[in-house]
């Protein structure tokens, strides 16, 4: 289940430190609050919940089961949206991965905490979203988004093989997720069609990478040595127990091969036969099965299935290959309205208020539905030219230029670069120099949808932990997980919305603050 070399389990039980300095990639800004800055990120909302899980969710049906437990489809009692809950037995662990001496179960539990810590840190449109964590004497409960489309594996069984456009759109999303993971020093180690889910059965354009139980943090100077993975997709260097993050690229190459011809490059009657072929690394493009497949596709497969991982392409290089660029979707004229609205909403957003930032990010990342996010998610992925799951200054400028090419909607905007700098200053909540997926969704979505009374009430209740009807600075410090921030800074944050100067924020003041940060009108 584990994430070796990961953050400590204490990060899961508490909250992630969000106190950063003002130095960042690509952008420099002045410190506020006497040099103190508070970074906002979606992971701060994922905490181990108190109480029984049955008080928050009720079971609809079982979705599946495995060695560690089962996955249930559940509904929220407050909000009624569907979630998938991974139920992990505390008494279960892979005895083959541990010695039989002491503290086996403790080690297993530590790895689960590490998996949770990893999932908290991820914010990408093609990676599973974690919402809540519960724990009792017998089980861990991981509450995630529910994807009704099933596994990519099922699509492969039903369709046998895919045309190059469909295959390219699938691979672009998988590689984008892997590229994002690798840039954050995370290796998945079990990429396979069973761990790729579809949001719905009618579209291949929104897939999710799931099951980070074998994932690990890595460093460039340290070779991974655990032999983990699934026979068809395991890289030869993993069998030798000396490898790096490029083992994920090999797995992607195997998936791409299967998508285009319907069978794996390394087959066999059993795992032992398959592994023998993987160890040799020899595969072929059968003429009859591959005669109508482009040379660009074969070239990319060869790059990803290069036996020597030192010579193998990276996920980013694969993502920017000729085949992906030729066959995968890009921004077109039909995207004009959504793109225009997204850029307009970012321009109008005033993100100086930290409490408002935290509230809008919570609503956008945790309370919106897949359907509500669909169009903006598609635009985000198309703007993300290098596929790393983040928008940088160059990509935002290109977005403006693309829109101008369609129609002179932004003719009054004279200095695009200056405008993009302002957008990054306002929308980059976590101060990393990029606009992350959840930041983009939260700021770009129509506020008439985002700011329903129910969602504003749920956001307010997130801060009002003692249910007193007022938000205090102590509650803010607890949510942000910061103990080193000065009292003056918290007073400033509270004062952003405290209209009656009672050193607390009631619901009416909270709503007023939220409506001030951006105009309701879309572009």
Curated annotation (Swiss-Prot):
Activity regulation information from UniProt: Activated by calcium. Upon calcium binding to the EF-hand domains, the C-terminus of the junction domain (J domain) undergoes a conformational change which results in the dissociation of the pseudo-substrate inhibitory motif from the catalytic domain. This, in turn may facilitate the autophosphorylation of the activation loop at Thr-230, which leads to the kinase activation.
Instruction: Extract one GO cellular component term from the record.
Output: symbiont-containing vacuole membrane
Tell me which residues make up the EF-hand domain: 371-406, 415-450, 451-486, 487-520
Gene3D superfamilies annotated for this entry?
EF-hand, Phosphorylase Kinase, domain 1, Transferase(Phosphotransferase) domain 1
Write out the catalytic residues in the record: 190 (proton acceptor)
InterPro entries recorded = CDPK_Ser/Thr_kinases, EF-hand-dom_pair, EF_Hand_1_Ca_BS, EF_hand_dom, Kinase-like_dom_sf, Prot_kinase_dom, Protein_kinase_ATP_BS, Ser/Thr_kinase_AS
- Subcellular localization, per the record? Membrane; Cell membrane; Parasitophorous vacuole membrane; Cytoplasm
Chief subcellular location equals: membrane
**SMART domains registered for this protein in UniProt:** EFh (SM00054), S_TKc (SM00220)
Q: What is its EC number?
A: 2.7.11.1
Q: Membrane topology per the record?
A: Lipid-anchor
Instruction: Give residue numbers for sequence motif J domain autoinhibitory motif.
Output: 345-352
Provide the function of this protein: Calcium-dependent protein kinase which acts as a sensor and effector of intracellular Ca(2+) levels probably in part downstream of cGMP-activated PKG kinase. During the liver stage, involved in sporozoite motility and thus in sporozoite invasion of host hepatocytes, probably together with CDPK4 and CDPK5. In the mosquito midgut and during the last stage of male gamete exflagellation, may play a role in the rupture of the host erythrocyte membrane.
Task: Family membership, please give it.
Answer: Belongs to the protein kinase superfamily. Ser/Thr protein kinase family. CDPK subfamily.
Fill in the domain comment: The junction domain (J domain) is composed of 2 motifs that maintain the kinase inactive. The N-terminal autoinhibitory motif acts as a pseudosubstrate inhibiting the catalytic domain while the C-terminal motif binds the EF-hand domains.
In Swiss-Prot or TrEMBL terms, this protein is called Calcium-dependent protein kinase 1
Please report the organism this UniProt entry assigns to the protein: Plasmodium berghei (strain Anka)
Taxonomy-wise, where does this protein's organism fall, top ranks first? Answer: Eukaryota, Sar, Alveolata, Apicomplexa, Aconoidasida
Recorded name of the encoding gene:
CDPK1
């Amino acid at each position: 289940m584990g994430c070796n070399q990961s953050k400590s389990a204490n990060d899961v039980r508490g909250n992630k430190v969000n106190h950063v300095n003002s130095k960042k990639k690509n952008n420099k800004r002045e410190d506020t609050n006497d040099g103190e800055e508070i970074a906002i990120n979606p992971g701060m909302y994922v905490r181990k919940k108190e109480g029984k899980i049955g008080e928050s969710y009720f079971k609809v049906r079982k979705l599946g089961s495995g060695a560690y437990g089962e996955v249930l489809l559940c509904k929220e009692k407050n909000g009624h949206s569907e979630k998938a809950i991974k139920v992990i037995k505390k008494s279960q662990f892979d005895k083959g991965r541990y010695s039989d001496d002491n503290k086996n179960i403790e080690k297993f539990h530590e790895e689960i905490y590490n998996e949770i810590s990893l999932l908290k840190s991820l914010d990408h449109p093609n990676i599973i979203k974690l919402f809540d964590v519960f724990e009792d004497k017998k089980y861990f409960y991981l509450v995630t988004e529910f994807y009704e489309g099933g596994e990519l594996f099922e699509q492969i069984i039903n369709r046998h093989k895919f045309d190059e456009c469909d295959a390219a759109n699938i691979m672009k999303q998988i590689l984008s997720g892997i590229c994002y993971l690798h840039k954050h020093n995370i290796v998945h180690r079990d990429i396979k069609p069973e761990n790729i889910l579809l949001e719905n059965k009618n579209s291949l354009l929104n897939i999710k990478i799931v099951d980070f139980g074998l994932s690990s943090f890595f460093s460039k100077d340290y070779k991974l040595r655990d032999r983990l993975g699934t026979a068809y997709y395991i890289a030869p260097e993993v069998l030798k127990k000396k490898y790096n993050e490029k083992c994920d690229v090999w797995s992607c190459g195997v998936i791409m091969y299967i998508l285009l011809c319907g069978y794996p490059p390394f087959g066999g009657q059993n795992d032992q036969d398959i592994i023998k072929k993987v160890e040799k690394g020899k595969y072929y493009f059968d003429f009859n099965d591959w005669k109508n497949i482009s040379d660009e596709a074969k070239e990319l497969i060869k790059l990803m299935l290069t036996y020597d991982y030192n010579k193998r392409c990276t996920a980013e290089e694969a993502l920017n290959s000729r085949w992906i660029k030729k066959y995968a979707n890009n921004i077109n004229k039909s995207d004009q309205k959504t793109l225009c609205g997204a850029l307009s909403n970012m321009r109008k957003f005033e993100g100086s208020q930290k409490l408002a930032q935290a509230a809008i990010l919570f609503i956008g990342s945790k309370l919106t539905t897949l359907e509500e996010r669909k169009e903006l998610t598609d635009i985000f992925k198309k703007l993300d030219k290098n596929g790393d799951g983040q928008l940088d200054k160059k990509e935002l400028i290109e977005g403006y230029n693309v829109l101008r090419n369609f129609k002179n909607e932004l003719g009054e905007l004279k200095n695009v670069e200056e405008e993009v700098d302002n957008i990054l200053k306002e929308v980059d909540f976590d101060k990393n120099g990029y606009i992350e997926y959840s930041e983009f969704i939260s700021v770009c979505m129509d506020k008439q949808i985002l700011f329903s009374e129910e969602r504003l009430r749920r956001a307010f209740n997130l801060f009002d932990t003692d249910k007193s009807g007022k938000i205090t600075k102590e509650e803010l410090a607890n949510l942000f997980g910061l103990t080193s921030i000065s009292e003056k800074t918290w007073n400033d944050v509270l004062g952003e919305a405290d209209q009656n100067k009672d050193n607390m924020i009631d619901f009416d003041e909270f709503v007023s603050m939220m409506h001030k940060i951006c105009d309701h009108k879309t572009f």
